[in-house]
UniProtKB/Swiss-Prot annotation:
Homodimer. Heterotetramer of two MnmE and two MnmG subunits. The lineage of its organism: Bacteria, Pseudomonadati, Pseudomonadota, Alphaproteobacteria, Rickettsiales. Keywords: Cytoplasm, FAD, Flavoprotein, NAD, tRNA processing. It comes from the Bacteria. Pfam families: GIDA, GIDA_C_1st, SAM_GIDA_C. This is tRNA uridine 5-carboxymethylaminomethyl modification enzyme MnmG. Belongs to the MnmG family.
Length: 625
């Protein structure tokens, strides 16, 4: 008989982070996967990061997660998206050598302390009654082996009753050539979880030797690539180029003439796909006024002959894929290595979860990744690390949930959106979803989260010490710049343009001026050069945003006050005067943990919030008296 503190099902991006996080905290953890050879597989595009997504990778890394370190080992084309805009919307992104990424992740996972990996298929899990509540008891494999555990994390990705479509061809699969998870889907139905259906897609893979690169636009990465991980010193792999081409009217004509043959137009038309990553068929249908759509040709590795054509996800038959591709410049003689396809799969209504990602129905059961209705490697990793941390922490009798607020992290924004609002389509993060994005930047994730992770043993002492040294240097440089006061006349002598208004300013204050940067003020303060690039950059960004932080920090304080006004889990909303039946039902279903969470539920009015506050204050005063 085998027993583990935490069992994780699925070896994708959510599963790897969940298993590693639980193990770091000290839980005896088991990761179960269909195939060890697919742990860390990049199922779709060979890239990590992007706008908002790159910040999530940094947040995962700040909590000692794996994704940032692994992509730094596999990066072959790095860039900062939105570099021309402010730091709050910078998006670190890196193309990966797909094979090196997977191999690096597998090496880490297979040698992780406290973590065992088992190659098996889980068909069912059992529950027991614990203090009048259903709790996880064990998982059962397809070979009828029983593995006992009180904490189970499901990270099934697109495998939960997954079905692949290529035109009219349909086959059960979670990924091309890999069997779906049918038994677990039936188990979730048995326990009355609210299930829905979503879909996503992937483009055909192309033979690099059949592409005419001479007619394509070369796109180089950053000359000095920036690592994702705060503990990575450099990017060591050679950096290679991507190439840009585009569809045209001939391409669109082929697609229009064959829309009736695409699975997305027929079998899948009622199943929601990612809104912000539409198929090429959907692009042509929705944006009929557009004459072309960009296609980025991305190498899948340094020694790979496969090209990933980003921008032409399709569910059309193979003959249509060929006909469409051969109208695109550079692809006139292209060979397809693997067909593009669409995959549909089950997901659960994430409003059935707490902010810890534990289910409300069954104690000890957690969901993370695409099973919660999200799309993207980064979103999955962010959920995985939170589920893993909470599953491990909850083994203790004095367990305090590890919850990241909307003001703490993009991960907090995502989870709060999911468990409060739910989703009817694949959810992805954007900077626009974060109210406090001036504070939630990709450059400061370690300053925001590493100490929080260290307090719950999710972060190593080595990383924490590095953070404290960095914080000390940031504080030192900031104080130096704040204590050097200079007049406009003195600044003019250094050719630094400011208004000649006679007002004395500190060097730190000067950084908020639009035409002044840290390099400019280095003329006055040589000591800046003694600090690391990361520290100098951090101080410069803080100086740039300083005037805007005053308002945002006040908003954050108001938000935190509402988040700290807790609503008891056993509250009877039907007993609160002034709440309509509809609002009572919504609140009873979602069970918001705080006034802040209740306020974000659609349909819950300001008057309803006031009624809840009055009720809470009355009962608090009654208890005191």
């Amino acid at each position: 008989m085998s027993h583990y503190d935490v069992v994780v099902i699925g070896g994708g991006h959510a599963g790897c982070e969940a298993a590693a996080a639980a193990s770091r905290i000290g839980a005896k953890t088991l990761l179960i996967t269909h195939s060890i050879s697919t742990i860390g597989e990049m199922s779709c595009n060979p890239a990590i990061g992007g706008i908002a997504k790159g910040t999530v990778v940094r947040e995962v890394d700040a909590l000692d997660g794996l994704m940032g370190k692994v992509i730094d080992k596999a990066s072959i084309h790095s860039s900062i998206l939105n570099r021309s805009k402010g730091p709050a919307v910078w998006g670190p992104r890196a193309q990966a050598d797909r094979l090196i990424y997977k191999q690096t992740m597998q090496e880490i996972i297979l040698n992780y302390p406290n973590l065992t990996v088992l190659e098996a298929s889980v068909e069912d899990f059992t529950i027991t009654q614990d203090n009048q509540k259903d709790s996880v008891k064990a998982v059962i494999t397809s070979e009828q082996h029983t593995i006992y555990t009180s904490k189970l994390i499901l990270t099934t990705g697109t495998f939960l009753q997954g079905t692949i479509h290529i035109g009219s061809y349909t086959t059960p699969a979670g990924r091309i050539g890999e069997q779906p998870s049918i038994g677990l889907a039936k188990t979730l139905e048995k326990y009355n979880f609210k299930l829905g259906r979503l879909r996503t897609g992937t483009p055909p893979r192309l033979d690099i030797n059949s592409i005419n690169f001479a007619v394509l636009q070369e796109q180089k990465g950053d000359i000095h690539p920036s690592p994702f991980s705060y503990i990575s010193q450099s990017i060591d792999l050679p950096q290679i180029s991507c190439y840009l081409t585009a569809t045209n009217n001939k391409t669109h004509e082929v697609i229009k003439n064959n829309l009736h043959r695409a699975a997305a137009s027929n079998l899948l038309k009622d199943i929601k796909a990612p809104r912000y990553c539409p198929s090429i068929e959907e692009k042509v249908r929705r944006f009929s006024d557009r004459n072309s759509h960009q296609v980025f040709l991305e190498p899948e590795g340094l020694n790979s002959d496969i090209i990933y054509p980003n921008g032409i996800t399709t569910s059309s038959p193979l003959d249509v894929q060929y006909e469409m591709l051969k109208t695109i410049p550079g692809l006139e003689k292209v060979n397809i290595v693997r067909s593009g396809y669409s995959v549909e799969y089950n997901f659960i209504d994430p409003r059935e979860l707490y902010h810890t990602l534990e289910t409300k129905k069954i104690s000890g059961l957690y969901f993370a990744g695409q099973i919660n209705g999200t799309t993207g490697y980064e979103e999955a990793a962010g959920q995985g690390i939170i589920a893993g941390i909470n599953a491990a922490l909850s083994l203790s009798s004095n367990y305090e949930p590890f919850i990241l607020k909307r003001s703490d992290a993009y991960i907090g924004v995502m989870i709060d959106d999911l468990v409060t609002l739910g989703t009817s389509e694949p959810y992805r993060l954007f900077t626009s979803r974060a109210e406090y994005r001036l504070r939630l930047r990709s450059d400061n994730a370690d300053l925001r989260l590493t100490e929080l992770g260290y307090k719950v043993s999710a972060v190593s002492s080595k990383r924490y010490c590095a953070l404290k040294n960095k914080q000390h240097d940031i504080e030192s440089l900031t104080n130096i710049l704040k204590n050097i006061i200079i007049t406009p006349t003195q600044l003019a002598a250094y050719d630094i343009p400011v208004s000649q208004d006679g007002v004395k300013r500190s060097i730190f204050d000067l950084l908020s001026h639009p035409n002044i940067n840290i390099e400019t003020v280095s003329k006055i303060c040589d000591v800046i050069k003694k600090f690391s690039k990361a520290v100098v950059s951090q101080v410069e960004i803080e100086g740039k945003y300083a005037p805007y932080f005053i308002r945002q920090d006040a908003d954050i304080q108001d938000f935190i006050e509402e988040e700290n006004t807790h609503i008891p889990s056993n509250i009877e909303f039907s007993q609160i005067h002034g709440l309509s039946k509809e609002i009572q039902e919504k609140l009873a279903h979602i069970k918001p943990p705080s006034i802040g969470s209740a306020r974000r539920i659609p349909g819950v009015t300001p008057a309803a919030i006031t009624s809840i506050l009055i009720y809470l204050r009355y009962h608090k005063n009654k208890k005191i008296s």
